[in-house]
């Protein structure tokens, strides 16, 4: 069973995949998207779904710190609905509060990566953290 984790932003989607047993998450890539042009990266996502034989999606929900939902939560849920309809694969949602902050801190403190390079990997690492949190909670 392979699970794909997604960190959906307004310009990119970070992608992570679980190992076949569902114990660990590995960051894969960042897919560029453009919400204004209705370009959501589904072609590339389709290739990854086939390549990894994905059984489930975990989409991060960027709730506010007071547990309320804002426009980004609605956008993530809309993205989840679209991929569920497109791929006929179940989608679950994982609270992703502070995962991007955690990812950035990891890149600064542990990897000493420059700001420019962090921007290129932050969403992939956030997707990995979202998926790993889900795996840790579920399995």
From Swiss-Prot:
Record EC number: 3.1.-.-
Keywords from the UniProt entry: Cytoplasm, Hydrolase, Nuclease, Ribosome biogenesis
Cellular compartment(s): Cytoplasm
Enzyme class: hydrolase
Superkingdom of the source species: Bacteria
Pfam families: RuvX
GO biological processes: rRNA 5'-end processing
CDD domains according to UniProt: YqgF
Keyword Nuclease: yes
Major location (coarse): cytoplasm
Gene Ontology cellular-component terms listed: cytosol
GO MF, one annotated term: nuclease activity
Family: Belongs to the YqgF nuclease family.
Biological role: Could be a nuclease involved in processing of the 5'-end of pre-16S rRNA.
Protein name: Putative pre-16S rRNA nuclease
Organism: Streptococcus uberis (strain ATCC BAA-854 / 0140J)
């Amino acid at each position: 069973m392979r699970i794909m984790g997604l960190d959906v932003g307004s310009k990119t989607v970070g992608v992570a995949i679980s190992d076949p047993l569902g114990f660990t998450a590995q960051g894969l890539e960042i897919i560029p998207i453009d919400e204004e042009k209705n370009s959501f990266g589904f072609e590339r996502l389709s290739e990854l779904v086939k390549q990894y034989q994905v059984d489930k999606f975990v989409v991060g929900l960027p709730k506010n710190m007071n547990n309320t939902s804002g426009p980004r939560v609605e956008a993530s849920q809309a993205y989840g609905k679209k991929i569920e309809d497109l791929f006929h694969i179940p989608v679950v949602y994982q609270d992703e509060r502070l995962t991007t902050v955690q990812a950035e801190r990891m890149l600064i403190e542990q990897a000493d990566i420059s700001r420019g390079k962090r921007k290129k990997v932050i969403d992939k690492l956030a997707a990995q953290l979202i998926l790993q949190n889900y795996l840790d909670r579920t399995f």
